[in-house]
């Protein structure tokens, strides 16, 4: 029940921070993540809350993708194939092959979500080439932590219980959000 409260200081910090060109997009990503956190609190009442939470996080990741693409273009970079795409695709394939037999009617939504979050990681990976250190490290570790958080959640929910799943999900998720914000705010 604390997870939505823990994201509010981060949203506030971005809101009051010095303006930067894509601040609204970052705020939108955080607010949709916050809405996803709230919706997931009610999963025990009805499965629709899981779907709505998934949609909220999907929207947040789309905002992160847009943010990263805009930042790549701002750096006069180009979106091109890099080796990281292969690693991300392998991870995505293995995870989905493990989960799909256990997803039931959620196969399509989970595949869509997994592709979108993998795209977010790939855009973060590309953007990291145009960012100085340590900003690029925050960006990459934040995006990877988001994937880890969602992977633990999915594995725990659909495949096999993970010991201390709640703790692992919260730690990786909160670090992910903090690191992504840290990579954007100067």
Language model features with spans:
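Polytopic alpha-helical membrane-helix bundles and their juxtamembrane interface segments
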Residues: 1-186
């Amino acid at each position: 029940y604390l997870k939505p409260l823990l994201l509010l200081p981060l949203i506030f910090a971005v809101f009051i921070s010095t303006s930067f060109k894509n601040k609204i997009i970052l705020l939108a990503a955080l607010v949709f993540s916050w809405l996803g956190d709230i919706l997931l609190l009610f999963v025990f009442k009805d499965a629709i809350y899981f779907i709505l939470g998934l949609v909220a996080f999907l929207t947040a990741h789309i905002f992160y993708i847009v943010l990263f693409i805009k930042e790549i273009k701002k750096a006069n970079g180009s979106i091109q194939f890099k080796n990281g795409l292969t690693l991300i695709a392998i991870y995505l394939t293995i995870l989905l092959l493990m989960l799909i037999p256990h997803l039931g009617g959620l196969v399509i939504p989970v595949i869509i979500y997994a592709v979108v979050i993998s795209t977010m990681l790939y855009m973060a990976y590309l953007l990291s080439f145009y960012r100085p250190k340590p900003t690029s490290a925050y960006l990459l570790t934040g995006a990877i932590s988001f994937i880890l958080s969602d992977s633990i959640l999915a594995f725990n929910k659909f495949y096999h219980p993970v010991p201390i799943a709640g703790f692992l999900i919260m730690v990786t998720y909160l670090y992910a959000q903090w690191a992504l914000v840290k990579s954007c705010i100067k």
